[in-house]
């Protein structure tokens, strides 16, 4: 899939070059979010405000790219899929605070940085997909993924992916490093195959009988359900809203940082504020099946039918702080090598 993303990146760079030369009212957005998920929302922003959004997409490495571009970087905002990516951008020194009364009013304190360095625009739950036919448990915890009764029955995408390092970061916060290592070793021992693909592949593999359970983001259930070629995968699974034994459901988010050298700061702030408006939050929920970050905006009905996530007592800041340790743990236990023979 990676090779197919080069064209949007090059096209985005060309848009930036032409837009900057023209001096039009615009904002330059670097993003790790798939264009198909975010572009319809950005098009609505442009239609309502007249501000053009120049989009540059890459699967990873955009914070480092902005750093290398220095004060010549055209990027005004970085929109990413994981809190740790945003805190990494802050650590690289490429951001400035994004604090306004509108953002503070709309977004709860738990979903924005205390120092104003980042702000969430949507939230997602890391849930368990389970076979309807082969798994009868009404509830499961994340710890259950390491239970020997699931040996040879677990599927996940690679542990190095941000969605899984986020979950592992939360596990470290809940269990401590030693118990988290034992847990991840247990999950590896239960793998049905070498981690590969994405979250949709977890549902696909369960439907094919390759595995019985796996972890994936909730919103993919909604996306697959409206895809005629993938709906059968959804029909084969139950969605279980898991918790940690002494905590809640792991929630991560997609969010924004304002770049240090933003040339279109006013437009960037305008976009950030618009993304947390009720209208934009409703679009996020309806189009992307994510959880709104703004109180009072309804969860998409299909997703709401799977139940409400239990609030976790581990903050996103704690998840971000454990990111390096989580990545090292994935490597240490050899998770992405797959099940041991």
Per-segment meaning from a language model:
Residues 312-341:
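Conserved C-terminal helix/tail region of periplasmic/extracytoplasmic solute-binding proteins
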Residues 25-87:
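Early extracytoplasmic/lumenal segment of secretory-pathway proteins
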Residues 163, 170, 175-242:
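Ligand-binding pocket segment of bilobal, Venus flytrap-like solute-binding proteins
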Residues 83-94, 113-140, 168-169, 251-257:
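Periplasmic solute-binding protein
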């Amino acid at each position: 899939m990676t090779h197919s993303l080069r064209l949007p990146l090059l096209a985005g760079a060309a848009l930036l070059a032409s837009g900057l030369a023209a001096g039009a009212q615009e904002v330059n957005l670097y993003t790790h979010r798939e264009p198909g998920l975010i572009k319809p929302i950005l098009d609505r922003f442009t239609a309502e405000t007249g501000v053009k959004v120049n989009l540059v997409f890459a699967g990873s490495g955009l914070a480092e790219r902005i750093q290398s571009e220095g004060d010549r970087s055209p990027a005004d905002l970085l929109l990413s899929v994981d809190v740790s990516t945003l805190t990494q951008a802050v650590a690289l020194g490429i951001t400035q605070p994004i604090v306004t009364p509108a953002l503070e009013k709309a977004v709860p304190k738990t979903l924005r940085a205390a120092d104003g360095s980042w702000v969430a625009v949507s939230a997602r739950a890391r849930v368990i997909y389970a076979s309807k036919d082969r798994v009868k448990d009404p509830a499961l915890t994340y710890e259950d993924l390491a239970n020997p009764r699931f040996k040879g029955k677990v599927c996940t995408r690679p542990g190095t992916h941000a969605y899984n390092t986020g979950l592992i970061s939360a596990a470290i916060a809940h269990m401590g490093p030693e118990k988290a290592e034992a847990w991840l070793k247990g999950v590896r021992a239960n793998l049905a195959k070498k981690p590969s693909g994405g979250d949709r592949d977890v549902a696909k593999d369960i439907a094919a009988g390759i595995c019985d359970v796996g972890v994936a983001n909730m919103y993919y259930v909604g996306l697959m359900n409206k895809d005629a070629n993938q709906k059968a995968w959804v029909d084969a699974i139950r969605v279980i809203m898991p918790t940690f034994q002494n905590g809640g459901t792991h929630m991560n988010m997609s969010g924004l940082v304002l770049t240090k050298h933003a040339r279109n700061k006013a437009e960037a702030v305008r976009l950030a504020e618009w993304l947390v408006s009720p209208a934009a939050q409703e679009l996020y929920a309806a189009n992307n099946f994510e959880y709104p970050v703004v109180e009072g905006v309804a969860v998409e009905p299909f997703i709401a039918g799977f139940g409400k996530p239990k609030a976790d007592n581990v903050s996103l800041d704690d998840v971000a702080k454990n990111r390096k340790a989580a990545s090292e743990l994935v490597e240490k236990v050899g998770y992405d090598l797959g099940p041991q023979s």
